[in-house]
Amino acid sequence: MESVDQSCSVPPGFRFHPTDEELVGYYLRKKVASQKIDLDVIRDIDLYRIEPWDLQESCRIGYEERNEWYFFSHKDKKYPTGTRTNRATMAGFWKATGRDKAVYDKSKLIGMRKTLVFYKGRAPNGQKTDWIMHEYRLESDENAPPQEEGWVVCRAFKKKPMTGQAKNTETWSSSYFYDELPSGVRSVTEPLNYVSKQKQNVFAQDLMFKQELEGSDIGLNFIHCDQFIQLPQLESPSLPLTKRPVSLTSITSLEKNKNIYKRHLIEEDVSFNALISSGNKDKKKKKTSVMTTDWRALDKFVASQLMSQEDGVSGFGGHHEEDNNKIGHYNNEESNNKGSVETASSTLLSDREEENRFISGLLCSNLDYDLYRDLHV
């Protein structure tokens, strides 16, 4: 077979992964202009006489297994007087889906790309398959009507089957998703996608390994040692953190503890206020006692003065000795009264010192109480 013979012409390790710009700007443009292609690896295929599952042998490049195949095809009209393209085969037909996408070379429009899906049977009762094809045509005006005749270059591939959880979402093959991106970005995203997939696989294996270790009873004695139990548990970034369920009993216990703490603070406030009020009462009592002692001393002094005056009036003209005795007695009384006043003033000073010490003690206890409240709130 000619295609099989030509497949051996490429050197070992040859890979053919052209971009959209390369397919349209180089291969298709040279094909339409009948110019020689340096390495002619794209076959001419009559798309209407071959089934998609036969493209693997007809479009083989070298001996490497491939998941996408390239070929040139010439479009023909379905009807001689119509405008529709004939895309029917013996087993089914190719149906266009979605809108055509523009292919740019830098900022210049060079072509359009159409996406088609292969259906088995005949319309409208065809059965959809996993075969996808991208059809490229030359175009210089994006709004121009599509050309229904002429050469096109095609890329055909099969969508990967969905397995497991992937059945919930429709997953296209890597080549299909790769071609949906802008052609200038594909060369950058391909290695990044590979690296991200490798990281995801390593993460999944690590997670499964850790879960198996946690589920199995290893029986290591050093894990159950007290010194290891007292250590804080380290959080692993690779494992998802699970939230502990909060029960109603835990919530009620927290509320009870909160109420008890509030009552404790209120009792402390009441006791502190009572202490301050009792201190004020003691101060008042001391002041009243000092004042009473002072007034008693003054009363004695005044009474002695009055008595001395009465004695002087009644005994005026008496003996000189009695006057001297009265004067001495008066002097003694006066000295006694002075001593009582001095003692009263000394008691006042001592009371003021005690009051200052009491106030300073209260201030210190108040500061300690505020610190205690700040630490326990």
Swiss-Prot record:
Composition bias, Polar residues: 337-347
Q: Where is the composition biased (Basic and acidic residues)?
A: 318-336
What's in the GO CC field? nucleus
Question: Where is the signal peptide, in residue numbers?
Answer: none
- GO MF annotation list: DNA-binding transcription factor activity; sequence-specific DNA binding; transcription cis-regulatory region binding
Task: Describe its assembly.
Answer: Interacts with NAC030/VND7.
Domain remark from Swiss-Prot or TrEMBL: The NAC domain includes a DNA binding domain and a dimerization domain.
Protein name, as recorded? NAC domain-containing protein 76
Organism the protein comes from: Arabidopsis thaliana (Mouse-ear cress)
